[in-house]
Amino acid sequence: MTKIGLIDYGMGNLFSVQQAFKRFNQPLDIISDIKTLQSCDALILPGVGAFDPAMMNLRKTELVPSIIDWVNNGKPLFGICLGLQLLFEASDEGTSEGLGVIKGHIRRLPQEKDERIPHIGWSPIYKTNECPILENYPGSNWMYFVHSYSACPLEPKHTVAVTKFGKTDVSSMVWHKNTGACQFHPEKSGVAGQKIIFNWINWLKKNKF
């Protein structure tokens, strides 16, 4: 069985993510140091909260160089919510440098008529590019969001799904090398979110990571 590590840096809802993967009989090992990280085949980077405190906490674990090497070497990583944002170079929300494994910036959601910030609730996502975790996926599906910022990848091909925020398309999923991430919470998005998780687990098994 693929050994998947769930990174614990004090800013992720670990229990709900573990429960979501448990539905597919996939255990997750809690990762908080380099030794346990190196024993894994794949990683999950969750996240709830603000960009700067998250990067500060992540640096305290001394895992940052290892995570950067992990992604750059093509090993699989799955980011969730704030975990997606940390993959980028920087954020409008703070002054800290992100992991920088995907080129681009995290921008505050635009002011749109009839839309509130933070964006909390259900919105459909629309596939814009192919990636393994969107294989055989319908044209759109509703996911659960809680965020005030969204990713703006330098290369548009890294956005694989968007959601409408007023009249603006904002990135809701990214893919680069073997790293994928969701701005929404797949673990809280019912059957549609479970499909994302299933596809990722299945992709790991097919590729024998």
Curated annotation (Swiss-Prot):
Q: In what residue span(s) does the Glutamine amidotransferase type-1 domain sit?
A: 3-209
Q: Identify one Gene Ontology CC term for this UniProt entry.
A: cytoplasm
Return the EC number: 4.3.2.10, 3.5.1.2
Q: CDD domains in the record, alphabetically?
A: GATase1_IGP_Synthase
Active site (UniProt) = 81, 185, 187
Specify the pathway.
Answer: Amino-acid biosynthesis; L-histidine biosynthesis; L-histidine from 5-phospho-alpha-D-ribose 1-diphosphate: step 5/9
Q: What NCBIfam families has UniProt attached to this entry?
A: IMP_synth_hisH
Summary of subunit composition and partner proteins: Heterodimer of HisH and HisF.
The protein depicted here goes by the name Imidazole glycerol phosphate synthase subunit HisH
Give the source species.
Answer: Prochlorococcus marinus (strain NATL2A)
The taxonomic lineage of its organism, from the top, reads: Bacteria, Bacillati, Cyanobacteriota, Cyanophyceae, Synechococcales
